[in-house]
């Protein structure tokens, strides 16, 4: 599954990746192998010692113990990414998906792409158009992207589906 996420993000050694919610660092380790630099933002203070232990050999990872919704994402991306657009990768819980993605859009940060793993229901809702009962904030935000913004950046694609047993075991 981690390889599929890295592939979906189109990651290279030249990329700076912003990982939202790295948890104990399992995906972060793989991201550090695929990307040039990884910025891992984790809100849970209790996970930081575990995360740092897991990532002790990953010299290209910076761990930040903050709430992604309260960080100046643009400033962080510009400082850590050297002015180049960053790629965002996250495994988002249902209840926080919309605020995080909206925050990324509204940050003005130089973002190359956003690759997130979300529940099927969220992915389905992200792909509906105007007039659907499920049309919501994320769909609306996609629809008002400036004309100079590449549709490629705004494309919503289901790259792969997670089997039910994997969803349960990852809880």
PLM regions with names:
Residues 1-171:
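Catalytic cores of RNA-modifying enzymes
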């Amino acid at each position: 599954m981690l390889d599929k996420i890295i592939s979906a993000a189109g990651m290279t050694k030249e990329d700076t990746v912003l990982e939202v919610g790295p948890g104990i660092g399992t995906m972060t380790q793989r991201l550090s192998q695929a990307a040039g630099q990884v910025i891992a933002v984790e809100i849970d203070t209790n996970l930081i010692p575990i995360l740092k232990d897991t990532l002790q050999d990953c010299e290209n990872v910076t761990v930040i113990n903050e709430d992604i919704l309260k960080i100046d994402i643009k400033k962080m991306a510009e400082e850590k990414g050297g002015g180049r657009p960053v790629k965002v990768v996250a495994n988002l819980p249902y209840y926080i998906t919309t605020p995080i993605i909206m925050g990324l859009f509204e940050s003005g940060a130089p973002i190359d792409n956003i690759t997130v793993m979300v529940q099927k229901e969220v992915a389905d809702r992200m792909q509906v158009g105007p007039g659907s009962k499920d049309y919501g904030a994320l769909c609306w935000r996609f629809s008002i992207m400036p004309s100079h913004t590449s549709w490629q950046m705004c494309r919503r694609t289901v790259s792969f589906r997670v089997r039910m047993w994997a969803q349960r075991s990852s809880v």
